[in-house]
Amino acid sequence: MPLDNVRNIVLVLSGKGGVGKSSITTQLALTLSLQGHTVGVLDIDLTGPSIPRFFGIEESKVRQAPGGWIPVDVHAQQTLSAHRLQKTAEGQEIGALSCMSLGFILPNRSDAVIWRGPKKTAMVRQFLTDVLWPKVDYLLIDTPPGTSDEHISLLETLLKNTSTTPHASLPYLAGAVVVTTPQAISISDVKKELNFCKKTGIRVLGVVENMAGFVCPNCSECTNVFSKGGGEVMARDFNVPFLGSVPIDPAFVQLVEEGTRPLYPEGTIMAGTDVSAAPNGKEAGSTTHGSRLLICE
């Protein structure tokens, strides 16, 4: 089975649409790659596949091989020079990154996917069984909102072919990252997703509160546009880890609109601390545009 080449599987879930699951998936994938891990991204949001846009590879097409589909390469394994990283070390290994999405298969990007449940279920199963992943350390699965046919088919197939504990011969279903926005209307829907994980036995790795404020492009001040702290309170109520808050950053949007992969550029800040001094070059999937990842206080 193609998943035999996968070491760890992480789901990115949310009970609410439009909270930024795909942007979180993209940043997780690029960050893991920057740390030297080989990463795959599977986009099973069939009616709104946006992962190709986030990676700037919308025009790419999957190739068919005798055993199944070959995922699209985002970038190959490479070494960034110490000069580019502004470090004294010899360099940094960037892990290979590849992805699979229905967006690569549709004849036109604007084509609507009007499928009933059985066809969606079959497509999800095909993505899990017919994609020829290379050896990857992490497979991130970007899911649609809610707890629909796609989720049920996804978990049925994964639970048959993976292990929920580290196992030498089976892919490890590590768990799920749950994404929300801070306002109450989003929290109420995302709570259903946490209950879904509990009922299906999927470990929740943590909650990310996205769009938790607005970063001013002039002064970098973060203003809480909606409410504040809803994701953290929800995580505490469900006794799961809270991974942090991510505000709206116009620089992030600009990178995506330009077709540039938003990979922790120089100036990335987490809770006021610089967490990446690297102006990652084009071969790493980014440019030296200043962009910030902030925690709103």
UniProtKB/Swiss-Prot annotation:
Which cofactor does this sequence's record say it needs?
A: [4Fe-4S] cluster
Coiled-coil spans are none
Cross-referenced Pfam families: ParA
The places in or outside the cell where this protein is found are: Cytoplasm
Residues reported in the UniProt entry to bind [4Fe-4S] cluster: 216, 219
Could you say which residues bind ATP here?
15-22
| UniProt GO cellular component terms | cytosol
Ordered alphabetically, the record's keywords are:
4Fe-4S, ATP-binding, Cytoplasm, Iron, Iron-sulfur, Metal-binding, Nucleotide-binding
Which GO MF terms are attached to this record? 4 iron, 4 sulfur cluster binding; ATP binding; ATP-dependent FeS chaperone activity; iron-sulfur cluster binding; metal ion binding
**Does the keyword section mention 4Fe-4S?**
yes
InterPro entries hit by this protein: Mrp-like_CS, Mrp/NBP35_ATP-bd, NUBP2/Cfd1_eukaryotes, P-loop_NTPase, YlxH/NBP35
A single GO BP term for this record reads: iron-sulfur cluster assembly
The record's remark on the cofactor is: Binds 4 [4Fe-4S] clusters per heterotetramer. Contains two stable clusters in the N-termini of NBP35 and two labile, bridging clusters between subunits of the NBP35-CFD1 heterotetramer.
Protein function: Component of the cytosolic iron-sulfur (Fe/S) protein assembly (CIA) machinery. Required for maturation of extramitochondrial Fe-S proteins. The NBP35-CFD1 heterotetramer forms a Fe-S scaffold complex, mediating the de novo assembly of an Fe-S cluster and its transfer to target apoproteins.
Summary of subunit composition and partner proteins: Heterotetramer of 2 NBP35 and 2 CFD1 chains.
Which family does the UniProt entry place this protein in? Belongs to the Mrp/NBP35 ATP-binding proteins family. NUBP2/CFD1 subfamily.
Q: What is this protein called?
A: Cytosolic Fe-S cluster assembly factor CFD1
Q: Which organism is it from?
A: Phaeosphaeria nodorum (strain SN15 / ATCC MYA-4574 / FGSC 10173) (Glume blotch fungus)
Q: By which gene is this protein encoded?
A: CFD1
